[in-house]
């Protein structure tokens, strides 16, 4: 069976919310990046599922809980008008436990591909780390690297989600 279902997989910290140099688990420190709600609305209007995939190793390190992560995700959903289709997080850290979900592994993407019956050739991943791009590549998803955090010549590389949405939408 063929499908036309398409998605944009979105890393969280550094793409959807501001990277503050440490773990972000408190809603009052969870600052949504400029242009994110509008960019997500444009992608949704073009028929994309919007799926957040984020490593949250602070849970494994006992710095915060899954409920803290979910509170930040609720703030994000509210700011974006509830248009996010799924929010997955990997709560493992290599120093504590192994996980096939934690990026650069592709477990979170694989779960979403199955759940939404996605055609990976029509999907994208937008992230600020090479591990995001590696997770996408493992399932055949094209990647867009955001920001200057990672050294290297990965392309395409853009400043923010607005510019990534322009590429995805062919603008």
Question: Whereabouts are the PLM-identified features?
Answer:
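Generic enzyme active-site microenvironment
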Residues: 9-11, 53, 126
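A short alpha-helix capping/helix-coil boundary motif
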Residues: 16-20, 53-56, 88-90, 110-113, ...
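Active-site neighborhood of HAD-like aspartate-dependent phosphohydrolases
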Residues: 2-49
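A short, structure-level motif marking secondary-structure boundaries and short turns
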Residues: 23-26, 61, 93-95, 117-118
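Substrate-recognition element of Asp-dependent hydrolases with the DxDx(T/V) motif
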Residues: 36, 40-73, 84-93, 136
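Charge-dense, low-complexity intrinsically disordered segments
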Residues: 26, 30, 63, 99, ...
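Asp-based, Mg2+/Mn2+-dependent phosphohydrolase catalytic module
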Residues: 2-4, 67-85, 94-171
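Conserved protein kinase catalytic core
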Residues: 17-19, 61, 134, 166
